[in-house]
């Protein structure tokens, strides 16, 4: 095989020539984490063992919006994951029972912009941004275009 000596290309025939989305870009002297690396890391680092009902009003008409909420027994935290695959910002009307007041939450946001990628020259162009916010689960939530947002709270 032509690319047998290259580890990244070794299994090229098994990819069925679909779009190849690497998690790392390996150069001669450096390795750069891509947005897909950070996306996989956000899923891996924010798992839960108890699934909860996080209702979104009028979600039937929304395409490419995904919401899941759960409780992690190990860290004793609630985790809310929101994914917007649309190219425009979306406002969601939430209705989560049992959370009647505002709470402090850790917010992790990964936003993708067309044409903006991590490269060896700009290794941190796309990466998650972490902040502490006040969250009200009975008010509207804004989702940036092409983004994944994770809220962690007690």
Tell where the protein language model's regions lie, with residue ranges.
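Aromatic/acidic polysaccharide-binding cleft in carbohydrate-active enzymes
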Residues: 1-69
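Short Pro-Gly-centered flexible turn/kink motifs
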Residues: 142-153
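Preference for extracellular/luminal or secreted protein segments
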Residues: 67-72, 119-122, 153
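Acidic, Ser/Thr/Pro-rich beta/coil linker or hinge segments at domain junctions
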Residues: 99-144
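Flexible loop/turn segments at secondary-structure boundaries
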Residues: 15-21, 87-90, 114-118
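Residues that act as N-cap/strand-start positions at coil-to-secondary-structure junctions
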Residues: 61-65, 88, 134-137, 145
């Amino acid at each position: 095989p032509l690319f047998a000596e290259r580890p990244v290309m070794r299994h090229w025939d098994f990819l069925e020539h679909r779009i190849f989305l690497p998690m790392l870009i390996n150069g001669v002297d450096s390795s750069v984490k891509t947005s897909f690396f950070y996306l996989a890391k956000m899923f891996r680092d924010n798992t839960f063992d108890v699934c909860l009902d996080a209702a979104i009003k009028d979600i039937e008409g929304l395409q490419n919006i995904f919401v899941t909420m759960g409780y992690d027994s190990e860290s004793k935290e609630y985790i809310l994951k929101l994914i917007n695959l649309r190219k425009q910002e979306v406002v969601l009307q939430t209705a989560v029972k049992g959370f009647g007041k505002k709470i402090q939450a850790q917010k992790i946001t990964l936003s993708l912009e067309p044409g903006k990628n991590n490269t060896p020259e700009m290794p941190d162009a796309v990466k998650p941004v972490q902040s502490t916010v006040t969250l009200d689960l009975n008010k509207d939530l804004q989702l940036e275009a092409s983004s994944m947002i994770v809220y962690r709270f007690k």
